[in-house]
Amino acid sequence: MKNVYEECPTFESEKWLLRFVEKSDAEDLLKVYGDKNALPFFNSDNCDGDNFYYHTKELMNKAIDFWLYSYKEKWFVRWAIVEKSTDKVIGTIEMFKRLSEDAFNESGILRLDVGSSYEKAEVLKEIMSLIIPHSFEMFDCKQLATKIPIYAVERALAAQAFGFEKTDKLLVAKDGVAFNGYWIYK
């Protein structure tokens, strides 16, 4: 597999397509990141105060610009999740390799954001199945980690289906703030 920061791969199944995010995704993504019911499921740990609530086209465009810049700088990759039956973008997946002084050093961090109507175990499992098998090779990581709040019951079921296990270890941000609620897959 080529370097993910030189050529972003696409992944697909009968229902879903994961492809690199594009500026033209803004209108669809506004429905995701402007969805107040989806907001509690977004992982904004260590994101400098951004809570990922983008309720205007201007804010959504600004976020996408940052995602594209971050890819160019090799900070993280952001895939759009396309529902093939509607040809609509229903969310994103962000991944990167974390280098740190804590238990999450050399972990592939997986952030999965979908609209609230897609926050269902079976849907999340289908989407995760497209990227998880490739994650270790793409990011040369020793484990995957994803945040699952205690109220995210459907998300927890999807993660358990892959063998993710809840950990009590804290992810420590660059400013020393510690975050809990992570699940690990090795």
Residues covered by each model-derived region:
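Conserved hydrophobic beta-strand within the GNAT/NAT acetyltransferase core sheet
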Residues: 143-148
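GNAT-family acyltransferases
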Residues: 1-117, 134, 138, 150-154, ...
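Conserved acetyl-CoA-binding loop-helix of GNAT-fold acetyltransferases
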Residues: 121-134, 161
